Amino acid sequence: MKIWVVVSINCLDIISLLSLEGIGRKRVGLILKQYRNISLSIKDIYEILKDKNYYFTLKELYQVYEKSKNIIEELNQSKIHMIDCLSTAYPDSLRKIEDPPLLLFIKGYYDFIYNEKNCLAVIGSREPTKKGKKTAYNIARYLARKKFSIISGLALGCDTQAHLACLKEKGRTAAILAHGLNMIYPKENEKLAQDIIDKGGCLISEYLPYEKAKNYTFIERDRLQSALSQAVIVIETEETGGTMHTVRFAKKQNKLLACVQYTPEQMQDYKLSGNKIILNELNAIPVRNYEDLDDLITYLRENKS
C-alpha cells in the first residue's frame, strides 16, 4: 500500500504551486482560499490541479516539492524570513489589498512594518533633477527625524536618497524589491541594501530567492510600497514614469497622496509632468516647504486610528 506524504497548505505548498509552469499567483490564491484548513497529500494536490485542467504527473509534483524543500533550506541559510498569507504574522495592511502577495520574503528586522500608520512611502524618478534629488533626501530626513519609517524601492535616484536620508537620522527603512532576495538590483545599491539591514531595516520581496526582475514585477511591487504606508509622498516623476504605478495603487487603496510642488518655472520641466497630473488631476496634497510637511504630519498623527 502506497503511503502518501501528508502536508497542509503552507509555505512549502505555496512555493511548489508557484513553481509549476502555467499557474499564476491568482490561481494559487484561489486554491489556498478553498483548501486553507484542510490537510492535503501530494496526491490530493495532483487531483485538485487535474480538476482545474492543470495536468502534471505525480513524479513532476514530487520533484517540484523536493526543489521547494531545498529553497526553504536555502532561505534558512541566508537568514531570509518567509511569511505566508495564511499566517498570523502576515501584515494586516497587505490583507486589505485586492491582490495580496501569497508569500513575503524578508531580510533584516521588520517589526516596524506592522505599524502602517508610522510608515511613509517616499518615491520618485530614477533620474531626477538635481533639485529633485536634494528634495528627496531632505524630505525623507525630516520625516525620519519625526520618527516615521521610510518605505521605498531601492531604485537609483529618489528612492536611494530616501533610504540614505533615513539611515542618516538613524531611522528605519524598508526597501520593497521587484526580484528575489538572493540578488540586489541595481548593483550600485548592494552596499546600501546591506546598510539598511545592518541598521535595523529590511528588504522585502514576494518573489522566490533567485527570481529576476521583469518589467511587470516592478509594477507589482509598487502596490506593496503604498499598501505598507499610511501615505505616499511623490518627489518627482514624469507622466509616464514608473512612480505613477504606485500613485494609482495608492488611490485604489485609499491612501493619502502627497506630492512636491516646485516653483511655477520648475514645474514646466517635463521631468515634473507627473507631478502636475498628481497635483491637478488627482488632488494630491501639495508639499512646497517644511510648513506643508508639518501640516501633513499633524494630519497623519491625528488620523492614526
Can you say where each PLM-predicted feature lies in the sequence?
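Short, positively charged patches
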Residues: 2-134, 141
